[in-house]
Regions:
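"…together with the soluble PPM/PP2C metallo-phosphatase catalytic core" -> "…together
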Residues: 2-274
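Membrane-proximal soluble regions of multi-pass membrane proteins
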Residues: 22-25, 29-40, 271-317
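Short, highly charged low-complexity linear segments
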Residues: 136-138, 234-238, 261-264, 283-292, ...
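Juxtamembrane boundary at the C-terminal end of a transmembrane helix
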Residues: 328-336
Length: 336
């Protein structure tokens, strides 16, 4: 019956996100036009360039996922009522993972609104953005500590699980770094949804392998929502997830493993995001030190564009990287 709950969560996530996408595309287009002070569509000269692809599509993911997780968890509890009073605090872990993911998504919404209002792609200033991301990470860690679910160590290849006192600080830094890395992936058609979809499938499998099968309703619901969102975000995109979708996906990849005590799994699962963000970090550091760029373009998807790769091939390439990260995560889980 719990398998039925996972299927129900995935199907409902797909259906709700697909329905919301049909509604959100025209609404977000009008919102962007209004906030930027543009003229109505019929008054725009037809010779002018087409309007930019609407962003903030991550709101579809957030709403669809929340409803689907609720339905999936109710189905799981109906099949196994002991989940409500489990000594492993299944419900507390699920709620904390949801809250943390939505907290990062809310930071992304604020970032997207700042992008629209300022007529630039820069969004929020770095200091307040990092402060909000750090607050979201601290919220997750604090709630886990209060509920007695905060992991006190980490899994290392060849050594297994070892206790590590500064682990909470490491996990907080990891969540913020992952959010920043995922943020720069926005703009590449379909890649955020495609890579996050692979990561969610991996988390479903890993939670089953590690004994957290009921909590797989969250990645199942988000996987269904991401698959539906690809109907609009697959190249050529008609709707982008925006910063809110990127940070929402990053929050899920970071918070779900953390809440089951295996935060280190988010490192390989987010491999494409680390490459995107790491390339930007190297570009900035090298330019400040040498006065010239290290790469012809950054992040990774821009570099691939510069080399003449099509948007569809970039999508497939980054999804392949995500599959490689999933394979590494499976290998890491075997040491647990």
């Amino acid at each position: 019956m719990i398998r039925f709950a996972l299927i129900a969560a995935s199907v409902q996530g797909f259906a709700l996100t697909a329905a919301l996408g049909n509604l959100m595309v025209p609404l977000l287009r009008e919102l962007q036009r209004t906030m930027r002070g543009a003229q109505p569509e019929q008054e725009i000269d037809r010779k002018e360039p087409e309007e930019p692809v609407p962003t903030i599509g991550g709101l579809c993911l957030m709403v669809g996922t929340l409803a689907a997780v609720g339905a999936g968890w109710l189905a799981a509890c109906a099949a196994q009522p002991s989940l409500l009073g489990s000594d492993r605090q299944m419900m507390s872990r699920l709620l904390i993972a949801l809250l943390g993911t939505f907290a990062f998504g809310a930071v992304g919404v604020a970032d997207d609104l700042a992008c629209i209002r300022s007529r630039s792609a820069l969004g929020m200033r770095r200091a307040p953005r990092l402060a909000l991301e750090a607050a979201a990470a601290a919220l997750v860690l604090g709630l886990l500590a209060l509920s007695g679910c905060l992991p006190a160590g980490l899994v290392l290849p060849g050594a297994g699980y070892i206790r590590f006192a500064p682990a909470p600080l490491l996990w907080g830094a990891l969540l913020v770094a992952l959010a920043e890395a995922a943020r720069v992936a926005d703009g590449a058609d379909g890649t955020v949804c495609g890579t996050a979809f692979v990561a969610m499938l991996g988390l479903m499998m890993l939670e089953t392998q590690l004994g957290w099968f009921p909590l797989a309703v969250f990645p199942a619901a988000l996987a269904g929502a991401l698959m539906a969102f690809l109907l609009w975000d697959f190249p050529p995109a008609k709707l982008h997830p925006g910063k809110c979708g990127c940070l929402f996906a990053a929050g899920a990849i970071g918070c779900i493993p953390l809440c089951i005590g295996y935060a280190e799994l988010s490192v390989p699962l987010a491999l494409p995001f680390w490459l995107e963000g790491g390339m930007v970090a190297l570009q900035i550091l090298f330019y400040r030190r040498r006065g010239r760029p290290l790469f012809a373009a950054a992040p990774l998807h821009r570099w691939l564009e510069k080399r003449g790769m099509s948007a569809v091939n970039i999508f497939y390439s980054l999804c392949a990287l995500s599959v490689c990260g999933l394979a590494l995560a499976v290998c890491l889980a075997r040491w647990a």
